[in-house]
Every structure is written in structure tokens, then in C-alpha cells.
Amino acid sequence: EAIIEEKIEKYIDGEIEEIPFAKREEIGCATDFSVGRNRYIGYLISLPTRSFKNKRVGLDCSNGSASAIAKSVFDALGAKTFVIHNEPDGTNINTNCGSTHIESLQKFVVDNNLDVGFAYDGDADRCLAVDENGNLIDGDLIMYVCGKYMKENGKLRNDTVVTTVMSNIGLYKAFDREGIKYEKTNVGDKYVYENMVQNGHSLGGEQSGHVIFSKHATTGDGILT
């Protein structure tokens, strides 16, 4: 992966004079895989061990890729789902909405007396949450909650969570109280996952909301989180 990124950087920086173009017969073809949506939804709803029955859940889909998926998942899990920013038009993705503008969801949750809210970014690989009072639950707190739960249930491999240098010291103090070990990487979910693979860890993430569960995915997945 690093080698590929270096080559791309050289193309961008102009260090390589000629960029090779694929021949017409080698380009390939486009395939309709619309069934993938239902497969993905089916996979997500197969994972939780607890129901959202009668929970009032707010979703901010950031006018992005979660717009066609998230509500179906929470509906299937029994939630009473309320959604904002789920009408992408090709230009409004992440515009004053989603996990980068959490204040929109905070107001929505409080105004509608919801139990919890989840905000995604445009490509839905990040998730931030909001409690019933509109308080932000960032990636650090999500990792703490998930790490504690997984440790208590014997699912936190090596009793370790992989974080980045951006995580708050409060997270590490909380981990210490729970007997959870931690490792720090450079900023970037790719570095988090690299550490997880090398050391066999099952949970890692960033304060920004990228959270990786290595048993289920190789990248952050906001809806899965």
C-alpha cells in the first residue's frame, strides 16, 4: 500500500514524465451490483446482540452514502428512526451536516425528545453520537464504551485498544481504571488498522469517529459502529 501511495505522489508532483494509460481493451467493464445494498444491510442487522425496540433514534446521514442504508438498518433493529440530511443531490454532501457539523444533530435530538443520535460523514466511515441531552459522544468515548463491553465479554483481544496520538488523556485514565491496555499510532485509520493486524488486536480507532472492529471490517464503518 505504501509503495502505491508513493507512486501516486510522484505522479502528482510531476516526478514521472509520462503517465501510462490503459488500452481500451484492457479497461474492463462496469457491473450492476445493486444487490450489494441488501446484502450489506442484512449483514449489519445480523450483528447486534441487543434490540433497539422502541428506542427513538436520530440519524444525520450527511447527504452521503449512509442515506440509502442507515434508516433501513435501524428500522430492522426495532428502532423508531428519525432522519435528517438524507437527500443527496450530488453537491450537498457534508454541507453543514453530518459528523463534521454535529450541532445540527444535537438540536434535532433535543427538539424531538430522542434517546440517542448518530451522525456520519459523507462516505459513512465515521460515526459520532449524541445522547438524549444533546451531549457529544466522540470517538474516544465510543472506543471506551466498546472496549469496556468487549473486555467484559471476553472479546477484546489482548485486552488492548489501538488509538492515535490525538486521543485525550482522559481516555487512557479510563482505560487504566478498567485494566485495558492501549497502543498509540500516528493519526490515520490506516495506521490504526496496520497496528491491529500486526499485533492481533480487535478494536481500534480515532477521536474523529473512525472505529475499526477487526472481526467485522478492515476499515472504519460508521453504521457498524
Kindly label every feature range from the protein language model.
Residues A2-I41, S46, N133-Q207, V211-F213:
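Proline/glycine-rich low-complexity loops and linkers
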Residues N63, G122-R126, G134, G209:
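Short, glycine/acidic-enriched loop or turn micro-motifs at the edges of active sites
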Residues E1-V110:
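Gly/Ser/Thr-enriched, mixed-charge loops and adjacent short helices
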Residues N112-L114, G200-H201:
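Short, high-confidence coil segments that cap the C-terminus of an alpha-helix
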Residues Y120-G122, L136-L141, A217-D221:
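Short glycine/threonine-rich catalytic loop with a Thr-x-Gly-x-Asp
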Residues S208-H210, K215-T225:
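Non-catalytic, conserved peripheral segments adjacent to functional cores
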Residues S62-A68, A124-D125, S167-I169:
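Gly/Ser/Thr-rich loops at beta-strand to alpha-helix junctions
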Residues L44, D60, I102-Q106, F118, ...:
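Buried hydrophobic positions in well-ordered alpha/beta secondary-structure cores of metabolic enzymes
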